[in-house]
C-alpha cells in the first residue's frame, strides 16, 4: 500500500496509532474490519491522498511525532527516545516534571523547595504538559493546578523589570521566610473589549473579546512593607504571561541557527521594502545580528559567553534548549539548587529581599531550626555564627549552596524535555481542512506562522556547558549535550517563523514584542488540559481560535502587520472561516 493510501485508510477508519516507550502500533477500528463481509472478499478502497499532504501528519517529522491524540497526547516520547535506549531516563525525567518538590525538613524523594518558590511542581503550570489555563475573576491563586500565569512587573517608562522582585515573582515561601508577594491581595479582573469592527463580521456574525487586568497593590509586596522604596515602587505596571506547551521544543532546538537567521533576513527585507512596518532593527540589521544590541543569547556565568541565536519564550530571552526555559525553570520555579546553580533565585537586584528578610524578627527567630535542615556548621560555618542577621543574609546570597538536585536527575529531566514528541496532525486530508489550509495561506497567516522547517545535523549546544561532576554517576565526565536525543534532517511543521512581532493589543505584553507562537498541537489543548477554553495568546485572553485571530488586529496604539490577514479572515464567508479554524485546530 502506498504511504498516501495508508494515511487515508487510517483516517477514514478512525484508527488510533499509539506511540509509546516500546514503539508504535496501529489499532484499526471495528468499522473497517466489519466492512469486509463474508460474501465480499475485496479490500476496502481508500481515498488517494496527495503524499505532500500525508507528510503533514508528521508534525515533528518521522523522528519527533506521536500518533496518540487522547488526553495524554502531549506527554509522549519521540521515537528517538526508544531508539537511543533512553526510555528509562525519560521516565525518570518525567517524574521530575510531574511530582512536587518539598522543603528539606519535610523529607521525601524530591527535597530542596524554597526558600522562595513559584510552584511546587512544573505540572502546576503546564496542565497535561501544555499551555496554562486562564483563571476566573478574583484572587490570583497559584495553588490552583493549571494556573500557568506568571506575573510580569515592570517599569512602563523603559519596559525594564523592577529590581525588587524576581523576573518571575514568587508567591510562596518556606517558613520562616516570607513570600515576596501576598497573593491574597492580588486581583485578576477580565474586561470585555469591543474592537473597531464592533465585534461583528460583514455577514453579521458576532464574536466576543476580553482582556485581563491585574491589580498588584504596594501592600502585597513584602520588601515594600518592610520599608524598601525606589523610583519604581510607586510607578510600575503588571501583565500576565502564561506558560506555553513544552512538547516539541527539542525539535525547535534542532533548527539550525543559520536557518533562523535567514528567516530574520527575509523579514528584514520585507521591512525595508515597506511590506511590514515593525521589525526589531536593534537586534537585526543589514542581514546581521546586532551583538551590541543584545541580539544574541549568551551565558557568561556557567558558560563561556559564546553567542547563540535566540529562539525561546515570548520575549526570546533564551537561546539553545539546554539553557532555556525548561532547564532554567526547574531551578528558578522551585529554587531547588543543583551543581551548576548553587544559589537562590531571588530578586533581580540580588540583595534587596535578603537585606530585609535578614532584619525581620520573625525570620530571625525561625532561621536556626531551618538552616539545620539544609546544611551543617562544618560545611557552612558562615550560616551558623552568633549574628543571625548575617547568617540569613549569607545564606540567601550564597553562591556555594549544597546541590539539592543530583546530576543524574537533572540529566533525566533534560532528556525528558528534549524527548517530548509533537502530536500528529488530525484529519489533515479532509477536504474542508485542506480548504482551510489554502485559506490560511491565501489571506496571509502563513507569513508569520511559517508552516515548516527542516532541522540540521542537530549538534546539540549547551551554553551552560554542563558536565557531570559526580564520580558516582554513570555519566561522570560526560556533557549534558552529548546525552540528548537528536533529530537530524527532519521536516517539521510548527507554524512559526521564530521571529518577534507586535500585535498592539489592549494591556499588551511587556515591550509589545512577542515571538510567533508555534501552532502545532494547540488544537488538543482542551483535550489534554481539561480547560473549558482554548486559552490562546500569551495571556490566555482568547477563548477560541476566532478570538485569537481577531486580537491580531485590535490595533491599540498602532497597526499590526497582521491586520491584512485579519481583514482577509473577516471577508471570508462563515463557512470558509469555519474551515480555516478547523485547519488551525487540526495541526
Predicted regions and their residues:
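Bacterial Sec-dependent N-terminal signal peptides
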Residues: 3-4, 26, 30-57
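Glycine-biased, low-complexity coil/linker segments
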Residues: 19-20
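N-terminal regions that are enriched for targeting/export leaders
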Residues: 48-77, 90, 94
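Extracytoplasmic redox metalloprotein regions
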Residues: 68-69, 75-89, 98-409
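Electrostatic cytochrome c docking/interface patches
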Residues: 72-113, 402, 409-441, 455-456, ...
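The canonical Cys-X-X-Cys-His
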Residues: 117-129, 246, 413, 436, ...
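An acidic, gly/pro-interrupted, aromatic-rich
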Residues: 230-255, 259, 263-266, 485-558
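Extracellular low-complexity, Gly/Ser/Thr-rich intrinsically disordered linkers
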Residues: 350-422, 432-438, 514-587
Amino acid at each position: 500500500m502506498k504511504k498516501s493510501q495508508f494515511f487515508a485508510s487510517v483516517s477514514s477508519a478512525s484508527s488510533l496509532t499509539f506511540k509509546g516507550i516500546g514503539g508504535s502500533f496501529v489499532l484499526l477500528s471495528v468499522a473497517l474490519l466489519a466492512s469486509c463481509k463474508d460474501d465480499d472478499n475485496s479490500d476496502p478502497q481508500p481515498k488517494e491522498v496527495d503524499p505532500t499532504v500525508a507528510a503533514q501528519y508528521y508534525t515533528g517529522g518521522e523522528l519527533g511525532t506521536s500518533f496518540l491524540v487522547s488526553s495524554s497526547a502531549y506527554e509522549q516520547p519521540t521515537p528517538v527516545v526508544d531508539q537511543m535506549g533512553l526510555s528509562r531516563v525519560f521516565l525518570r525525567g518525567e517524574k521530575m516534571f510531574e511530582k512536587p518538590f518539598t522543603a528539606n525538613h519535610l523529607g521525601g524523594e524530591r527535597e530542596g523547595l524554597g526558600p522562595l518558590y513559584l510552584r511546587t511542581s512544573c505540572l502546576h503550570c503546564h496542565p497535561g504538559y501544555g499551555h496554562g489555563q486562564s483563571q476566573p475573576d478574583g484572587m490570583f491563586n497559584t495553588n490552583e493546578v493549571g494556573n500557568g500565569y506568571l506575573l510580569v512587573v515592570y517599569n512602563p517608562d523603559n519596559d525594564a523589570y523592577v529590581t525588587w522582585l524576581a523576573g518571575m515573582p514568587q508567591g510562596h515561601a518556606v517558613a520562616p521566610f516570607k513570600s515576596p508577594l501576598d497573593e491574597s491581595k492580588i486581583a485578576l479582573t477580565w474586561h470585555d473589549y469591543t474592537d473597531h469592527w464592533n465585534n461583528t463580521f460583514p455577514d453579521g456574525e458576532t464574536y466576543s473579546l476580553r482582556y485581563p487586568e491585574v491589580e498588584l497593590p504596594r501592600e502585597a509586596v513584602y520588601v515594600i512593607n518592610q520599608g524598601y522604596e525606589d523610583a519604581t515602587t510607586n510607578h510600575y505596571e503588571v501583565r500576565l504571561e502564561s506558560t506555553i506547551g513544552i512538547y516539541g521544543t527539542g525539535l525547535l532546538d534542532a533548527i539550525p541557527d543559520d536557518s533562523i537567521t535567514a528567516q530574520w533576513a527575509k523579514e528584514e527585507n520585507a521591512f525595508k521594502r515597506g511590506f511590514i512596518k515593525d521589525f526589531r532593527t536593534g537586534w537585526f540589521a543589514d542581514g546581521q545580528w546586532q551583538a551590541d544590541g543584545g541580539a544574541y543569547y549568551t551565558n557568561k556565568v556557567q558558560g563561556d559567553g559564546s553567542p547563540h541565536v535566540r529562539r525561546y519564550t515570548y520575549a526570546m530571552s533564551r537561546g539553545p534548549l539546554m539553557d532555556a526555559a525548561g532547564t532554567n525553570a526547574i531551578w528558578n520555579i522551585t529554587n531547588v539548587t543543583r551543581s551548576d546553580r548553587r544559589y537562590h533565585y531571588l530578586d533581580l537586584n540580588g540583595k534587596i529581599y535578603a537585606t530585609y528578610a535578614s532584619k525581620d524578627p520573625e525570620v530571625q527567630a525561625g532561621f536556626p531550626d531551618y538552616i539545620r535542615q539544609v546544611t551543617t556548621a562544618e560545611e557552612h560555618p558562615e550560616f551558623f555564627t552568633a549574628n543571625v542577621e548575617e547568617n540569613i543574609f549569607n545564606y540567601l546570597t550564597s553562591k556555594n549552596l549544597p546541590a539539592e538536585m543530583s546530576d543524574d536527575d537533572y540529566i533525566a529531566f533534560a532528556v525528558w524535555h528534549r524527548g517530548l514528541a509533537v502530536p500528529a496532525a488530525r484529519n489533515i486530508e479532509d477536504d474542508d481542512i485542506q480548504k482551510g489550509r489554502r485559506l490560511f495561506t491565501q489571506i496571509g497567516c502563513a507569513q508569520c506562522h511559517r508552516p515548516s522547517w527542516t532541522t540540521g545535523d542537530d549538534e546539540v549546544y549547551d551554553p551552560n556547558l554542563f558536565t557531570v561532576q559526580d564520580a558516582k554517576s554513570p555519566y561522570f565526565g560526560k556533557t549534558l549535550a552529548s546525552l540528548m536525543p537528536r533529530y537530524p534532517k527532519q521536516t517539521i511543521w510548527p507554524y512559526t517563523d521564530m521571529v518577534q512581532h507586535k500585535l498592539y493589543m489592549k494591556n499588551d505584553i511587556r515591550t509589545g514584542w512577542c515571538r510567533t507562537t508555534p501552532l502545532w498541537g494547540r488544537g488538543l489543548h482542551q483535550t489534554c488540559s481539561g480547560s473549558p477554553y482554548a486559552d490562546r495568546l500569551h495571556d490566555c485572553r482568547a477563548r477560541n481560535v476566532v478570538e485569537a485571530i481577531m486580537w491580531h488586529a485590535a490595533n491599540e496604539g498602532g497597526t499590526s502587520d497582521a491586520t491584512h490577514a485579519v481583514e482577509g479572515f473577516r471577508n471570508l464567508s462563515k463557512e470558509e472561516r469555519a474551515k480555516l479554524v478547523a485547519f488551525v485546530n487540526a495541526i
